[in-house]
Amino acid sequence: VWNGDKSDDAQLGKLETLPFTVLFVDGNHENFDALNEYPIEQWHGGKVHRIRPHVLHLMRGQAFELQGRTFFTMGGAQSHDIADGILDMDSPDFYKRYDALRRNRGQFRINHISWWQEELPSNEEYEHARQTLERLNWQVDYIITHCAPTAIQRKISASFKPDKLTDFLEEIRTRS
């Protein structure tokens, strides 16, 4: 899930040996090219990527019923370490820019290597999330996310800027 190659196997193998099922939502630095290669299945009422038999990625905007409780999931997050930009390896000046940014300790990421546009939910994922919450009358027992709603994020650190996802999570917080 991290590199999208055989190097992931050892770490995923360790997770698979744990005496429980590992569940996770995605964040902002996932390898979405690799993650989206895994099969999608229905699991406890919502969609998952099955990474291993006991390692599951809980997809965005889903509701899961576990032990009589409802869990709503909304992964994703805005990268805060890209002040100097996102580089494209296909750009003719990639190596020049990369070397300069590394020398100056720049804050940057590389498209489809360390940054993916999918770090934030798509409009379709927001729409699906709203439909899921409407079906549940915006009442769930637990909300699992990677980032916090805007009001909570402000209490944690003023350096984090609100974005569409944190505002959406704030809407959920105030409506639930």
Residue spans for each PLM region:
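Core catalytic region of metal-dependent phosphoesterases/phosphodiesterases
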Residues: V1-L66, A158, P162-L165, L169, ...
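Active-site-proximal loop/helix segment associated with metal-binding centers of metalloenzymes
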Residues: P53, Q67-S159
